[in-house]
Amino acid sequence: EIYQKMESDGEVLSARDRFYYGRELFYHREYVEAVDNLLKFLQLPEGFVENQAEACRVAARCCYELKQNGMALEFLYRGLTYRTPSGELCCDIGKHFSDRKKWEQAVFWYRNALQVSENAKTGGFVEKECYGYIPCIQLSVCWYYLGDIEKAFQYHCQAGTYKPYGREFLKNQQYFISVKQ
């Protein structure tokens, strides 16, 4: 509401304000307006690089909600143009492909998520699980559907090193125990 009022009062939003306004609209499920504001932010040259990459991720989530899957993927790829790939962005792209049962493409992106180093010094939003647990759990799923149960099990075990009490890990653990017997 603060940003809406600023705009209606004729104030020009700074790049930072435009970014946070777009995020706020997303969290209030105003997806079309969110994408519009995030695009305006991305057109501003003074935008912080980490915020530009994050804006692409948020815009992609809006597009998924709006059932514009192709545009969502375009935003995710655009996020790669602002900085070196992050675990978060690699996981988002991997999810795009795994949701469509394109397992080999998903494997590529989840493997990349494991290769990327988490860099908290950039000042961007860091989702620690995107650098270990999530890619491992998802690689386990991908390899299962690709028919390689051994690789699926290996990634399952690796996921457990990151989060031994994770809901997904424990659920998969029951499955692998039943298969191994």
Regions of interest found by a model, annotated:
Residues 11-12, 46, 50, 84, ...:
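Short coil turns that delineate tetratricopeptide repeat
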Residues 1-40, 46, 179:
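Catalytic-site signature of metal-activated, phosphate-bearing donor transferases
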Residues 31-32, 69, 103, 149:
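TPR-repeat structural position
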Residues 16, 50-54, 88, 127-129, ...:
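Start-of-helix register in tetratricopeptide repeats
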Residues 20, 58, 92-95, 138, ...:
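"A position-specific structural signal for the A-helix of alpha-solenoid helical repeats
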